[in-house]
């Protein structure tokens, strides 16, 4: 029995001890977990004490999951807050009489027990404007949107239309200024009946339900049906009475249905005015409610609420304007007061409906707000604002379809007429689509016209036509190929001055050099001369015309004419085809790429040809040509081949034209045993061949050494092609047949056909590597992305820009060859002499450097002191430098 005995331990001063401990903790700011702010000052407190002393704080703190929330109290002074804190922690506070009323009012708003338990109404509840973050902006991750809504519902007066939503609070009611402003709005609408307060209370209750359940897009189906189905003014009074009896019982109609049904209400002017005001109010409160639901800082909520209150006053004016638009018939219904009440109710409902629409939709509606309402006589049509909003349209299609089942056929007809903004709206949109598609097709057609399948025909055709031949003839005086101009040019060039010349000028000067300094060659006056359309230069038939295949050809090939222009010129001049050779060439290449135009002159026949086209001697069969020119042609034509093939081509030319060899030997005897151009070119070929054998010592890849950089560049004649006139390339019955016919007195049209067919064959057969007879490694294997030739190693497949680099690779690198160049000062070995030179200059600066192997690429020495050399500038042009002593030097 003794074991069952229990003792009661009582702490007599338990409550006083706890209260004193709380006070001590507050003074030391120990274990504080919330902050109250007023007038820019802060007081830290404990959540437990605040919840125990105030049901308002208890409800608010239950929804806050932040570790240390901050509550900003508006309309509460710091002295009043400090007094209430002392009252809650100590149970008593001393205050003066003049501050008593303000303290009691603040305590009533915060529902402090002992100060507001027995009081009801009159006070204004200040709201915390920011809850859930610290002073420095620290936010809580667990603070969700739903919790924010609940917290703001508990604050009371958070929304501008909120009524008495504090039913769960103990002993407190929170009437707000917003309610008084809404009442003032109803009085301005001349609705002095008792239904206003009930309508507003029903709207506020409905909004609280919408916010708690999250169904932001729901409104009353009964209200909207009554608003849209009334064909006369009397329907407004019926809708008003029905709404009062059944306030907001259904929440299944979406925003789009509301818009569609408001559109159909065009018969009653009073209903139209009310709908206009409702839609305008919806614009304002969409932004307000969106900002309210997104904001965490309650200060922003307060600011938005005040903005909404001011906006309500602005809406009052809009409602008055809507009534004025209705005209004198706006109150012709059976019950004008009820109609006005219906207008107010419609505005509240649509305002609640639009309060949860997203911000982008709100902005879109504001842009078209001014154009949304139109009135003709006694009718008013309201266009739905979100008709073309993709988000709202996709969201509400299903609900709209369900609600249209309740609409009559008349309503559907009325809705169909205005939902798309009138008849012209959809038709205009379809027309715009059609025009747009046509524009796209037109642009594609224009692009196709500008596009040309041939890469060389993309530039504008600048070849001169028949009418421009006179201008070309006038340019004869400016040509450097005339004798007087050439003499003046030689005189003007001093010994120390150097000039960059074009390919045509260089080729002409080269042949002139051969012609004047070698055996005398008889030259007869030719009946035909050829004029370049790009530079206006006169090309003598015996002149060696060169083309820079990779440079000038790519720049000037696009300046030629197309096939249609060729046919027009040929028909206009009534030309005749030059024998079977021209016919065979035309059939071989039916689509001409390069054409020319001719025009008859009173003095001499002139043929305009592009400089990019190779021209042969039109009198080659009559006038013997010096073998030097033939060898030069072979040299420059076969620049893409190795030099053994060039020598072989020279021998073939000598065998095919024995009379030229005899003639040249006779010329040598007449010249007194002078060295012929054949000797000069043979010497040139031998020097080139010897230099190829020593390419590992003379040539380096560009970039290794500045001293030996020029040795790695490609040779000048590699970029020059000359057409073989003896038929070695095209056959005896093709090119030579044409020019033989021209030499026997052919007309201008025959020259046109001959040159056209000859160019067709030239550009068909002289592709890169196409004229190579044996797969030589010195011929390009393809074309790179930049249009330059690519030399590919036949052993390992590596590709190089320069053929000299390819030869160096095959000799010193390909196949894992060991370095062959030994440094004389250290064990370093290099595969290239240029790298060895760089090594010596870098690591052995104080020791004797390696001797330079750099020399000119092409040199021509004469016994009488005449010498010359040619170089290239890597851009499709040759450079020949002269001095006053008649000597050619490499620049």
From Swiss-Prot:
Keyword annotations: Developmental protein, Differentiation, DNA-binding, Metal-binding, Neurogenesis, Nucleus, Phosphoprotein, Repeat, Transcription, Transcription regulation, Zinc, Zinc-finger
GO molecular function: DNA binding; DNA-binding transcription factor activity; zinc ion binding
Positions of the BTB domain: 32-97
InterPro entries with a match to the protein in the record: BTB/POZ_dom, Dros_DevTransReg, SKP1/BTB/POZ_sf, Znf_C2H2_sf, Znf_C2H2_type
Tissue specificity statement from the Swiss-Prot or TrEMBL entry: Expressed in both mesoderm and ectoderm with expression highest in the mesectoderm by stage 11. Becomes enriched in a cluster of brain cells, in abdominal histoblasts, and in the embryonic imaginal disks during later stages.
Chief location bin: nucleus
Protein name: Longitudinals lacking protein, isoform G
Species per Swiss-Prot/TrEMBL record: Drosophila melanogaster (Fruit fly)
Species classification: Eukaryota, Metazoa, Ecdysozoa, Arthropoda, Hexapoda
């Amino acid at each position: 029995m003794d074991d069952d005995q229990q003792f009661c331990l009582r702490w007599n001063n338990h409550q006083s001890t706890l209260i004193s401990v709380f006070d001590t903790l507050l003074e030391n700011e120990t274990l504080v977990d919330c902050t109250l702010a007023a007038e820019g000052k802060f007081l830290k407190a404990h959540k437990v004490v605040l919840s125990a002393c105030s049901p308002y704080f208890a409800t608010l703190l239950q929804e806050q999951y932040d570790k240390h929330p901050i509550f900003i109290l508006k309309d509460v002074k710091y002295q009043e807050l400090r007094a209430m804190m002392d009252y809650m922690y100590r149970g008593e506070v001393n205050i003066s009489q003049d501050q008593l009323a303000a303290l009691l009012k603040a305590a009533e708003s915060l529902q402090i027990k002992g100060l507001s338990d027995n009081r009801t109404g009159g006070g204004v509840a200040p709201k915390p404007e920011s809850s859930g973050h610290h002073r420095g902006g620290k936010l809580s991750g667990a603070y969700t949107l739903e919790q924010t809504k609940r917290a703001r519902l508990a604050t009371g007066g958070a929304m501008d239309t909120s009524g008495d939503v504090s039913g769960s609070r103990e002993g407190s009611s929170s009437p707000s200024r917003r309610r008084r402003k809404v009442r003032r709005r109803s009085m301005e609408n001349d609705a002095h009946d008792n239904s206003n307060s009930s309508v507003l209370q029903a709207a506020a209750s409905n909004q609280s339900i919408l916010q708690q359940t999250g169904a932001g897009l729901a409104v009353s189906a009964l209200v909207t049906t009554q608003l849209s189905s009334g064909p006369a003014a009397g329907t407004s009074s019926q809708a008003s009475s029905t709404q009062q009896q059944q306030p907001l019982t259904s929440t299944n109609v979406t925003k789009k249905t509301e818009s569609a049904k408001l559109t159909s209400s065009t018969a009653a002017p009073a209903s139209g005015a009310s709908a206009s005001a409702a839609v305008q109010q919806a614009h304002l409160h969409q932004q307000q409610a969106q900002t309210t639901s997104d904001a965490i800082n309650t200060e922003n909520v307060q600011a938005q609420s005040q903005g909404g209150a001011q906006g309500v006053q602005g809406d009052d004016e809009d409602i008055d304007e809507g009534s004025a638009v209705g005209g004198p018939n706006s109150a012709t219904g059976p019950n004008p007061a009820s109609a006005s009440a219906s207008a107010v109710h419609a505005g509240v409902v649509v305002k609640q409906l639009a309060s949860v629409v997203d911000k982008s939709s709100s902005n879109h509606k504001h842009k078209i707000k001014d154009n949304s309402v139109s009135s003709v006589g006694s009718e008013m049509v309201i266009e739905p604002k979100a008709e073309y909003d993709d988000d709202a349209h996709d969201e509400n299609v299903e609900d709209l379809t369900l609600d249209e089942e309740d609409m009559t056929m008349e309503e559907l007809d009325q809705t169909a007429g205005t939902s798309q903004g009138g008849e012209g709206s959809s038709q205009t949109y379809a027309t715009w689509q059609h025009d747009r598609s046509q524009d796209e097709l037109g642009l594609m057609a224009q692009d196709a016209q500008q596009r040309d399948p041939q890469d060389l025909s993309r530039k504008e055709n600048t070849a001169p036509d028949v009418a421009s031949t006179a201008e070309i003839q006038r340019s004869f005086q400016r040509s450097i190929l005339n004798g007087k101009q050439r003499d003046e040019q030689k005189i003007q060039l001093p010994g120390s001055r150097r000039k960059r010349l074009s390919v045509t000028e260089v080729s002409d000067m080269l042949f002139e050099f051969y012609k004047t300094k070698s055996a005398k060659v008889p030259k007869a006056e030719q009946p035909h001369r050829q004029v370049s359309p790009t530079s206006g230069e006169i090309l003598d038939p015996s002149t060696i015309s060169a083309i820079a295949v990779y440079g000038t050809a790519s720049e000037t090939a696009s300046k030629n004419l197309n096939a249609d222009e060729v046919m027009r010129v040929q028909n206009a001049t009534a030309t005749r085809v030059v024998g079977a050779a021209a016919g065979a060439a035309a059939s071989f290449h039916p689509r001409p790429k390069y054409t020319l135009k001719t025009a008859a002159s009173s003095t001499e026949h002139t043929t305009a040809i592009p400089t990019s086209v190779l021209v042969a001697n039109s009198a080659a069969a009559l006038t013997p040509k010096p073998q030097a020119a033939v060898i030069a042609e072979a040299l420059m034509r076969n620049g893409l081949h190795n030099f053994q093939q060039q020598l072989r081509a020279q021998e073939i030319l000598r065998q095919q034209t024995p009379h030229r060899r005899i003639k040249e030997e006779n010329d040598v005897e007449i010249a007194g045993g002078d060295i012929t151009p054949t000797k000069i070119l043979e010497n040139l070929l031998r020097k080139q061949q010897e230099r190829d054998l020593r390419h590992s010592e003379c040539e380096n890849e560009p970039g290794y050494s500045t001293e030996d950089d020029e040795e790695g560049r490609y040779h000048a004649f590699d970029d020059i092609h000359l057409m073989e006139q003896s038929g070695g390339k095209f056959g005896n019955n093709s090119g030579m047949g044409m020019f033989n016919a021209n030499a026997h007195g052919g007309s201008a049209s025959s020259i046109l056909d001959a040159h056209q067919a000859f160019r067709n064959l030239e550009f068909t057969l002289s592709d890169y590597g196409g004229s190579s007879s044996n797969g030589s490694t010195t011929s390009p294997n393809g074309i790179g992305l930049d249009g330059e030739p690519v030399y590919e190693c036949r052993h390992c497949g590596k590709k190089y820009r320069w053929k000299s680099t390819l030869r160096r690779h095959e000799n010193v690198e390909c196949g894992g060859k060991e370095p062959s160049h030994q440094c004389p000062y250290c064990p370093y070995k290099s595969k290239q002499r240029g790298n060895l030179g760089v090594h010596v200059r870098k690591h052995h600066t104080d020791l004797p450097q390696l001797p330079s192997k750099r020399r000119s690429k092409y040199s021509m020495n004469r016994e009488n002191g005449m010498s010359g050399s040619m170089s290239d500038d890597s851009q499709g042009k040759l450079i020949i430098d002269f001095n006053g002593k008649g000597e050619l030097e490499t620049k």
